[in-house]
Amino acid sequence: MRVVKRYSWLWVGLLLFLTASIAMLLLTSNQRPSFTTATWIWNAKLISSQTEEIVSFAKDNQINLIYLHIEPTRVSPQAYRAFIQKANEANIKVEALGGDPNWAYTANRQSIGDLVSWVKAYNQMAKVDEQFSGIHVDIEPYLLPDWKKDQEKVVNQWLKNVDYLITETKKDGKLQVSADLPFWIDTVTVPGDSEKVSNWMLQRLDSITLMAYRNHAMGHNGIVDIVEKTVAAANSAKKASVIVGVNILESSEGSNVSFHEEGTHEMKQQLVILQEELAENPAFAGSAIHDYESWKHATQREEQL
């Protein structure tokens, strides 16, 4: 009887162990993927001589997405291939970055077509681990003089060009399409409709990066305050589609739009608060820091103190 009793306890222990293991497995499988930490590299010439340095900085700061400017006349395809391969080794995705306020005009649609064509031709020639994972545009039509004169006309052409960008990009291949948008884009409506431009973009693009350039996460006019409506509106799609961007580039637009004075430590603290506040939103995908060079210079200044 002692033997039977002893083995019965072993079976009970084994059963408890298996139950706990299955529970942990289910819990792990239900957890959402890690958040995105992105940055912009506008001066693509840097990758020709600083690939190791950039990737090392990215790893140190948990960057897993880079928007890399396309400059075919200054940077060779070989340089792009070498950089993307190194980035992929570090589990960092790279999206092709392009854009100009004038790209909002349908008369300048060819510039969008040229970017898409270049990226597709590049990817066809590159190995899988050397390819761009998507196209990311920064158009900012509100910088045009016409935005104040005839906003409806500009918005109408802008949306047509975004439709064109998506159609051309998605014709073949699996490239993602994303865009930078101002945090206040939810106050602009589609011409002839009551739909918000923010919702229009979210329905069509794979993701958006909201330029929520503030240096505090909480409180009135803080980062959470100015993005939460757009994030909430995107939740119904049940996909991580909204990246929240902050700025560390020195700015003359005001004392609260950049972390240039506060520094990288304070910026990271505020981004932790941002993530904690928005983590339960399915649409919240992570954060982006503008831009790599400014972030790197700020880090170097702090290291010298």
Q: Model segments located where?
A:
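Aromatic-lined carbohydrate-recognition surfaces of secreted/lumenal glycan-active proteins
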Residues: 95-102, 158-195, 239-250, 288
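Active-site groove signature of glycoside hydrolases
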Residues: 67, 119-155, 285-289
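Substrate-binding cleft of secreted/luminal carbohydrate-active enzymes
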Residues: 236, 240-305
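Catalytic domains of carbohydrate-active enzymes, especially glycoside hydrolases
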Residues: 50-74, 128-131, 207
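Aromatic- and acid-rich polysaccharide-binding/catalytic face
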Residues: 63, 72, 194-224, 292
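Short, acidic/polar
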Residues: 44-59, 108-126, 189-201, 265-278
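Boundary/entry segment of secreted carbohydrate-active catalytic domains
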Residues: 24-61, 179-183, 249, 287-294
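Aromatic-lined substrate-binding rim segments of carbohydrate-active enzymes
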Residues: 65-100, 149-179
